């Protein structure tokens, strides 16, 4: 793996640390490498949860590497599998990803965090989409995902003026799950990851599949859809060994042993 990415496996948890000088900014080469990491995570049956963070205490990621842009890298360059930062366009990832935001998450860095399932951030974290000030748009998910969380007036201000949002405000709006001290950030992210590992993997996959496919449907239509048999994970989880193991472990007052089948 490149010098820009540090990977650590802790049992079934994969930790990815983005480590690039000048604000952990991401060029096309690094984005390709991140895409390979996330696709390998998706396909590795031994891995259950991923944590993505940035090196240092100032920047999670400043997004697209503007130095690379100044040297000719185009905004519509091929950023590799998974889109920008390797995660923003993986739409079929049925394992959870936690963004441990250790500082500024600007532009594509914020979009990377928004592509995760959970955001745990340090109290010094700050979020912004300043692309309009650079003559471009946050088209790696920012302008698409943020309106699903925030009211239109707040979205407009963030994407059109580049307004920054601090950690506590992001928590109030429901953008982030937790705000902790810098010193507690990774321990907190690992604690959340372990809680996810304690849940059945097929159930997690089914939940993500249901969210992904029914989020824009009326509730009644969504009910019919998930029971129609077209989904991959939901029908299988109902008849899985894990669906037997969970109640059995509860009755026997022990921790369940998940098999993922």
Swiss-Prot record:
One of its GO terms (biological process) is fatty acid beta-oxidation. The keyword Lyase applies. It catalyses: (R)-carnitinyl-CoA = crotonobetainyl-CoA + H2O; 3-hydroxybutanoyl-CoA = (2E)-butenoyl-CoA + H2O. Keywords: Lyase. Pathway: Amine and polyamine metabolism; carnitine metabolism. Pfam families: ECH_1. GO terms for molecular function: carnitine racemase activity; crotonyl-CoA hydratase activity; L-carnitine CoA-transferase activity. The active site is at 111 (nucleophile), 131 (proton acceptor). Its EC number is 4.2.1.149. It is an enzyme of class 4 (lyase). CDD domains: crotonase-like (cd06558). Signal peptide: none annotated. Belongs to the enoyl-CoA hydratase/isomerase family. PANTHER family: ENOYL-COA HYDRATASE, MITOCHONDRIAL, ENOYL-COA HYDRATASE-RELATED. Homotrimer. HAMAP family: CaiD (MF_01051). Catalyzes the reversible dehydration of L-carnitinyl-CoA to crotonobetainyl-CoA. Can also hydrate crotonyl-CoA to hydroxybutyryl-CoA. This is Carnitinyl-CoA dehydratase. It comes from Escherichia coli (strain K12).
